[in-house]
């Protein structure tokens, strides 16, 4: 049966071809795997030039919309209505002439992009729209044929690789490291890698005993023996193990005994210094009875000089108290005060410059509120004592309820 009208361009197609194709949804006949005839392609382009929409062209010629769009897109891009090659491989566009031109462009401008090379090939007439290689093909040509990798030969001197009009010059081979074969252990060091000759070993020798510092903390002594061996962590605190590594002529017997006493002393002394750290003559010199006469001499001169300079217009004063008086003045609940060594040895001018004038006077040091350990001693400010927050409702007695009373009950 013939479903084509007289004006249908498919009327030239025989019904024997229907076995390989069929009828599309628009009623047109197509042959599976074969392109549209050139007559239909030309008609599609003519209708498109007349301003007919692709959907109207598809319904009028009874060709699928995808086929019309593909033909028009190829025409707008390349200006050709010919179908693509079906089957087989595409014609080779990377001819030796094209490869040579691409290599020449890259030598002139190594940063030239592939699309710039493609445009230049078209501008210079080396290729036309049908034979110009694609951007991916140009990148592949540059990667495989223009910039071939360098393969050094077995003798260590690279062999220059060359293509048509393009030559890659190998870089100078680095000299082998001389110490790699001689010293397998030293070859992994920085000197071995850089090929620096090893210095004389005699210069690196040290004395039999090398002290790392002038301090002895009783736990560790820094030294390096000539044989490279030293006491382990278990024997560092042992005097006997240390003596084994000390030479007999390095220290005298008295020095060794002094070291023994230092090692036997605990690492962390008490907070209060003991008498063993002070020599007998120093203990007599800095004892409290020896310091009292000096303090008695300083007290009158200090009081008279300060009072004469400051005047008598001071409202509240705190005179300097000597060590003997302060030792006898003891507050309840506190240990007796022991004056530090050298108290009272400052000159009058120095004390006057260190403390403001309002803090010194010759009046006696008397504070009656500190005589007993009570609430008044704890809170010297009477304003704080009268505050309702420091007393409960029972201690205040009966009275009208206030906000503070409610606060205490809660």
Curated annotation (Swiss-Prot):
Q: Which GO terms describe its cellular component?
A: nucleus
Task: Region Disordered: list its residue ranges.
Answer: 146-184, 221-242
Provide the free-text tissue specificity comment from this protein's UniProt record.
Answer: Expressed during embryogenesis in the kidney, optic stalk, midbrain, otic vesicle and a row of cells along the spinal cord and the hindbrain.
Instruction: Tell where it localizes.
Output: Nucleus
Major location category of this protein: nucleus
What Gene Ontology molecular function terms does this protein carry?
Answer: DNA binding; DNA-binding transcription factor activity; DNA-binding transcription factor activity, RNA polymerase II-specific; RNA polymerase II cis-regulatory region sequence-specific DNA binding; sequence-specific DNA binding
Which PROSITE patterns did the record assign?
PAIRED_1 (PS00034), PAIRED_2 (PS51057)
**Spans annotated as RED subdomain:** 97-145
Q: Tell me, which GO biological process terms does this entry list?
A: anterior/posterior pattern specification; anterior/posterior pattern specification involved in pronephros development; cell fate specification; cerebellum development; cerebellum formation; cilium assembly; closure of optic fissure; embryonic camera-type eye morphogenesis
Q: Where is this region: PAI subdomain?
A: 22-78
Extract the DNA-binding region annotation as residue ranges: 19-145
The protein's name in its UniProt record: Paired box protein Pax-2a
| Residue ranges with Low complexity bias | 169-181
**Superkingdom classification of source:** Eukaryota
Q: What is the effect of changing residue 79 to V?
A: In allele TY31A; no midbrain/hindbrain boundary
Q: What does the protein in this record do?
A: Probable transcription factor involved in the development of the midbrain/hindbrain boundary (MHB) organizer and specification of neuronal cell fates. Required for establishment of eng2 and eng3 gene expression in the midbrain and MHB primordium during late gastrulation.
Protein species of origin:
Danio rerio (Zebrafish)
- Composition-biased stretches, type Polar residues, lie in 146-165, 229-239
Key words of the record: Developmental protein, Differentiation, DNA-binding, Neurogenesis, Nucleus, Paired box, Transcription, Transcription regulation
Lineage at the top is: Eukaryota, Metazoa, Chordata, Craniata, Vertebrata
